[in-house]
Amino acid sequence: MSDLERTSATLPPTGKSTRLKFITLSVTALLFVLLGSMAAQAQTIPLVVTATDAGRFYGDPNPAFTGTITGLRSGDTITVVFNTVANPGSAVGSYQIVPTLVDPDNQLGAYAVTINNGTLTVTPAPLLVMADDVARAAGSPNPTFTGTVSGLKNGDVITATHDSAATADSPAGSYAIVPTLQDQSGNLGNYSVSVANGTLTVKP
């Protein structure tokens, strides 16, 4: 029996014999198709590329990204590089780490590739705001309060003013000097702020 066969049939309603052409696959042809498909699948090697998650503070450079390639045949020269759109100026948040395969010897066609992106998490940078301690005599006006803002990134302009509840009429004692931040750059949300009050000592 050949791989392709022709058959005839009689139509029951009229009793007239009409030759109908049917094209059927024999068992041999069907097996050939199935085996060919299986062979093509068997020649495709699973390759899984996974980027490792990473993290850094706002304003810092990106770390060296890493990851894994699983399923690479011995001797194949496929490598991977990792990239993200995030840079030191990127706001706090999550960014994809995307693997890109490098195939100098055109071997990638032998693989069925699965790509798993990683996540770069940018967290708020620590910002320390401190008011300096100072003393004065009772009955005197408050001096100009000073302090420091430490940990600014990317040229951000965030300053502090300092104030105290004490007045010239306040009795001798200790009073808090409280910093208040002024966010000229609009980037205060990218910082984790710690505030250290100063102390105004009013002497008798």
Model-identified regions with their sequence ranges:
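Sec-dependent, cleavable N-terminal signal peptides
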Residues: 1-43
